[in-house]
Amino acid sequence: MNLAKIARKIVEYALEGKDYEIPDEIKEKLNYKAGAFTTIKTLDNQLRGCMGIPYPIYPLWQSLKYSALMAAFEDPRFPPLQKEELDNVKFEVTVLTPPRKLIVNNPLEYLEKIKIGKHGIIIKRGPYSGLLLPQVPIEEGWDAKEFLSYGCLKAGLPMDCWLDPKTEVYVFEGQIFEED
């Protein structure tokens, strides 16, 4: 079962003004709580939308539906996806494990605890938070320090906010589904 293909179908239906009803047999397999993000990229790998549900508060089938619709139509960095663009984009879905707070005595320990290619991160301080998926530092060629710094930026905080003991760092893992 390719979740990226289901995400595409959800968006295709929405562009027709319809609600895609995920088949019951698929819903049954995806009826456990999990976070999910949908990433939409152009065929030349430019980001076109990426949004999702970071925490396991909905059944996966519902997180998938929400994330697909948000990535296509609500990502504030991009205009809503248009029907004409469908042939020129690819969908990717990342299913997230529950985020786990990293406990450190010194913020520099984050550099050892975060595993590039395995962990995604959530940076939180006060009302601010930013999430980066596990595949992002690989795609961008970042080390752990750059990953943390860009996580801070994503949260709308200074790039070195991860060095502040008041900043919380969470890690999660992701299972990635891509279109063929």
Swiss-Prot record:
Domain AMMECR1, residue spans: 1-180
One Pfam family hit: AMMECR1
Domain of life (superkingdom): Archaea
Entry-linked PANTHER family: AMME SYNDROME CANDIDATE GENE 1 PROTEIN, AMMECR1 HOMOLOG
NCBIfam families (UniProt xref): AmmeMemoSam_A, TIGR00296 family protein
Protein name: Protein NEQ441
Organism from which the protein derives: Nanoarchaeum equitans (strain Kin4-M)
